[in-house]
Regions:
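Extracellular/periplasmic catalytic domains that process cell-envelope and extracellular macromolecules
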Residues: 7-8, 164-168
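Solvent-exposed, acidic/flexible segments
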Residues: 147-151, 165, 181-184, 217, ...
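Structural recognition of the beta-strand scaffold that forms the well-ordered cores
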Residues: 12-17, 22, 171-176, 204-207
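Short glycine-enriched nucleophile-adjacent loop
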Residues: 1-6
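Second-shell loop/turn segments in exported
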Residues: 142-145, 177-181
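C-terminal catalytic histidine-bearing segment of alpha/beta-hydrolase fold enzymes
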Residues: 28, 155-156, 182, 189-190, ...
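Accessory cap/linker subdomain of secreted extracellular hydrolases
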Residues: 17-165
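Short beta-strand/loop motif that positions the catalytic acidic residue
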Residues: 158, 168, 173-180
Length: 259
């Protein structure tokens, strides 16, 4: 949004938590090596499939791809997003669209996990790996990477939707976990570097060491609030205490449930 707001005097700035970018590069280049490395450690420590970061992350990427495909179809009705998936995963991808185009599943559903698009893929990955004990997570027949990499409609979408290609003259605070497997840190690092190269004067990247996707955002809640109060205040006069802003002891930051 910030890229389109350079001429909008009412737009004051933006906070971005692990901004989605370079989906093609993540899926085709970064994820296979990263998830294979994580999986090797999980196997070494006998982590069950349902608790593996590698499984959850690959399911998340497949859900992203499905929602991306449905989004493309919304403006290009002739596009068949099912084609970017292998036969086993085609019906799962269709949950992103739903039966009417308006009742598709969201990435997550806290009240009913069975209605989570991520869980649809995750459950099937687990089923596949349970039935094929010699297979690794990247062996799951999910995305058809050759079609994804060469389909002209997909390629055009990834180029046109890529953020960080225009100078931004408003302050931007970017929070990024260095252990994020959904949006890897090097991807966001390159995004921020490019924005600075384009002459964006106030872009701050805050790497949260060892933090995952959502974890990083929770851990930097106080910093995000301070940034918003500094640059994007609504002028309500409400002032939060440090204790109210700080979420560093929250279990979603520490990873430790309260006892």
């Amino acid at each position: 949004t910030a890229e389109y707001a350079n001429t909008d005097a009412t737009y004051k700035g933006a906070v971005a938590g692990a901004p989605a970018s370079s989906l093609g590069k993540i899926i085709l280049e970064v994820a296979p090596a990263a998830l294979s490395s994580i999986e090797a450690q999980e196997i070494q420590y006998n982590i069950p499939l349902a608790a593996r970061t590698s499984v959850d992350s690959y399911a998340t990427l497949l859900a992203y791809a499905a929602l991306t495909g449905v989004g493309i179809k919304a403006y290009e009705p002739r596009f068949s997003y099912q084609d970017i998936f292998q036969s086993r995963a085609k019906s799962l991808a269709e949950f992103a669209e739903g039966s009417t185009g308006d009742n598709g599943l969201c990435l997550d559903n806290d009240s009913d996990p069975s209605l989570s698009l991520i869980n649809k893929f995750k459950d099937d990955i687990i089923q596949f790996m349970t039935a094929n004990l010699d297979k690794k997570v990247m062996d799951y027949p999910g995305l058809d990477t050759s079609v994804f990499a060469t389909n002209e409609t997909v390629k055009n979408f990834l180029i046109s939707s890529q953020p960080g290609t225009k100078r931004i003259d408003k302050p931007v605070y970017v929070i990024q976990g260095t252990a994020d497997t959904n949006v890897p840190y090097p991807i966001t690092q390159a995004l921020v570097a490019n924005l600075k190269t384009l002459g964006s004067p106030n872009i701050t990247l805050d790497p949260v060491i060892g933090a995952s996707h959502t974890q990083a955002i929770v851990c930097r809640n106080a910093e995000a609030v301070d940034f918003i109060q500094t640059y994007m205040s609504a002028g309500t006069g409400i002032v939060l205490t440090d204790a109210q802003k700080d979420a560093s002891t929250n279990e979603n930051c520490t990873g430790i449930a309260p006892t």
